[in-house]
Amino acid sequence: MWVIAMFDLPTDTPKARKAYARFRKDLLEDGFTMMQYSVYSRHCASIENAEVHVKRMGAVVPAQGEVRFLTITDNQFGRIKVYVGKKRQPTTQSPSQLQLF
């Protein structure tokens, strides 16, 4: 089972940014990893285990904002299609030694 957390939290005030950062930190501490901005996923051994994590994270949702949790099977997760628009250009590699002229 996979739990996917999708959230939209305000960041317009310092207090809201702090709440956003705290929620994101709680997600990471609970074993979630970032799939893309504001979308995090976590693998769970069973539906019961997934429900425990959803309840735990649901209890720390900031007062302002919205969070949705989606529970899907391993098979469904494996069928996720990812499309990437413009690929990032690789950074030029720095020389391993300084060259003096």
Swiss-Prot record:
Keyword rRNA-binding: no
Obligatory cofactor(s): Mg(2+)
Organism lineage: Bacteria, Pseudomonadati, Pseudomonadota, Alphaproteobacteria, Hyphomicrobiales
Protein name (record): CRISPR-associated endoribonuclease Cas2
Gene3D superfamilies associated with the record: 3.30.70.240
Annotated positions binding Mg(2+): 8
Keywords of this entry: Antiviral defense, Endonuclease, Hydrolase, Magnesium, Metal-binding, Nuclease
Statement: the UniProt record of this protein carries the keyword DNA-binding: no
Function: CRISPR (clustered regularly interspaced short palindromic repeat), is an adaptive immune system that provides protection against mobile genetic elements (viruses, transposable elements and conjugative plasmids). CRISPR clusters contain sequences complementary to antecedent mobile elements and target invading nucleic acids. CRISPR clusters are transcribed and processed into CRISPR RNA (crRNA). Functions as a ssRNA-specific endoribonuclease. Involved in the integration of spacer DNA into the CRISPR cassette.
